[in-house]
Amino acid sequence: MKILVLGCNGMAGHLISLYFKEQGHEVVGFARSASHLLDKTIVGDASNMSLIKQTLDEGNFDAVINCIGLLNQFAENNKAMAVLLNGYLPHYLVEITKSMKTKIIHMSTDCVFAGNDGPYYEDSLPNGSTFYDRSKAMGEINNDKDLTFRNSIVGPDIKESGIGLFNWFMKQNGEVGGYTGAIWTGVTTFTLAKAMEQALKENLTGLYNLVNNESINKYDLLGLFNKYFRGGEIIINPNDKLQLDKSLRSKRDDFGFVVPSYEQQIKEMREWVDAHPSLYPHYKLF
């Protein structure tokens, strides 16, 4: 398949694009700077809608994977751009590919929900209150041609400055706190990449909560990071100050992909990092 990955240098985008390339697909990246992992990157800004349209009109892609998003505080501080990238862009991609074979795969988040009345299903009404939450809810696409995967993600980042939970943990020494009341359902970016490939093979469409239908708290998740990446050297102290449950559950039974257990996902994430050491020199691994 010929795949375009929008945001191919980000935490999710770099791994997804490289995974598809390693599976033998033709992968083209789109980012503000060229990817050193891909043979071809279209360099540009995602706010340039005419460039996006030209790229899709000329590319003859089987699928476009949208890994572009303005996160959390960046969305709060740049509201117009958050509406454009998080809310408008996914629907624009759908609109300009309506008459093409090209399938859009969009990434949404558990943050479309407030976290005080979970668990949340595909048909639950998004009730997140921050500007980021609302902009991401606006961007969810749900039709019979394209696909939105709704999930939270963790994974390695080629940028040392990345703001993800795993990147944060890998910079820590000594003792850290882990929230026992922050309840999470999510996937690693490696699991997400595998699920995306399977979804294309099965032509999964609509809105799908990509989860294993089990929850884990952030304290235990950090414990898995510690076990598989730091040899247990970090002391994780339980902290119950934050109480938040954004657990996702899937009602759908029309997808053959099985999301592994959290332990298995983190184990496979370590295997990915070990197989690509030049990408992650900033991680201190045991």
Model-derived regions, located:
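Glycine-rich NAD(P)-binding loop of the Rossmann-fold in SDR/ketoreductase-type enzymes
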Residues: 77, 81-92, 126, 130, ...
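Amphipathic terminal alpha-helices
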Residues: 260-286
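Mid/C-terminal beta-alpha module of Rossmann-like enzyme folds, strongest
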Residues: 193-245, 277-286
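NAD(P)-dependent short-chain dehydrogenase/reductase
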Residues: 129, 141-191
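NAD(P)H-binding glycine-rich loop region in Rossmannoid oxidoreductase-like domains
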Residues: 44-87
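Rossmann-fold cofactor-recognition segment
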Residues: 34-48
